């Protein structure tokens, strides 16, 4: 009798855990503090989650996470620094440190940046004039297609 009770309890616990599990839907992420979890384009997904439609995380080196600014193991995304509206601005990243993130709406970046110069900024931390961006800007390991999709998304932000 004890074996049957244990078996029934184990089955019920398994069903409960399965019901509580995540049920991913196409074109969604587990959700972030920046987005709703539903994205209309790959570029928008990248901006808010640093993950491409393929499910691949877009990694980086440097940036606020390397400086200890992203406390609690937060995931760094474009929106983390440049905001949901792309306007950037001065904000605190913990421990009395501030960051002045650039406005990256495409309408503001033009004519200083084109796609090639934007790629250098995103992947190598290089400004259009050849100087290095400060250490707050991560150096992203992003594919050419994902970068093109991100630029297309930035072009839609008013």
Give residue spans per PLM region.
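C-terminal motif of bacterial Sec signal peptides marking the signal peptidase cleavage site
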Residues: 16-19
């Amino acid at each position: 009798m004890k074996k049957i009770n244990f078996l029934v309890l184990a089955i019920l616990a398994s069903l409960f855990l399965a019901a509580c599990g995540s049920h991913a839907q196409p074109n969604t992420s587990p959700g972030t503090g920046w987005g709703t979890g539903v994205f209309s384009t790959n570029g928008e997904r990248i901006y808010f989650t640093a993950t491409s439609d393929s499910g691949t995380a877009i990694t980086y080196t440097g940036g606020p996470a390397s400086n200890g600014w992203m406390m609690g193991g937060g995931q760094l995304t474009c929106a983390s620094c440049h905001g949901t509206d792309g306007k950037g601005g001065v904000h605190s990243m913990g421990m009395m440190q501030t960051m002045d993130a650039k406005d990256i709406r495409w309408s503001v970046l033009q004519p200083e940046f084109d796609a090639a110069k934007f790629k250098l900024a995103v992947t190598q931390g290089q400004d259009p004039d050849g100087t290095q961006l400060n250490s707050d800007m991560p150096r992203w390991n992003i594919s050419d297609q994902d970068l093109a999709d991100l630029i297309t998304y930035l072009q839609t932000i008013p």
